[in-house]
Amino acid sequence: GWFSEQIIIAGDSAGGGLAMALCHYLKDHGKQLPCGIVAMSPWTDLAASGESYETNFERDPLFGKTRDSLIYNKDYIGDNDPYNAYISPLYGDFRGFPPMLIQVGSYEMLLSDSVDVAAKAREQGVKVRISIYEGMFHIFQMAAKMLPESKRAWVEIGKFIDVLLND
């Protein structure tokens, strides 16, 4: 088996939000948390309250001008409360969370999700590294070897994991 000190949860977009939501759930139910979280362009605020939903509306090539079909998709939350921490991790209590690496592009509609969750977690005592990659779009890391920023992001993730697992 594996011990929590050997587990890092990672995800991109909704998966990044789910990684945080899972940690809220584990904490709320008295379970061991992983030793770290890697969240790439995480979707943490399904209430879409952040400033970047407006300021980056036309800048993000993945989401630009598609609010109704992608961001405000009721199929994801149904009739549930978008302020529930298991749906929108931003609204949860981060005290006791493991260290987090959050990566986001400056052109993302979800930029505020990352900035706001990093600030809240940091205020609640969590070690958070947020890296905002200038001019990058939602889940730019998927470009792997095609963009220098993507390469840099994966190197950063590798170093973060090395530190967590070798401390």
Task: List PLM regions with ranges.
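Alpha/beta-hydrolase superfamily serine-hydrolase fold, recognizing
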Residues: 1-167
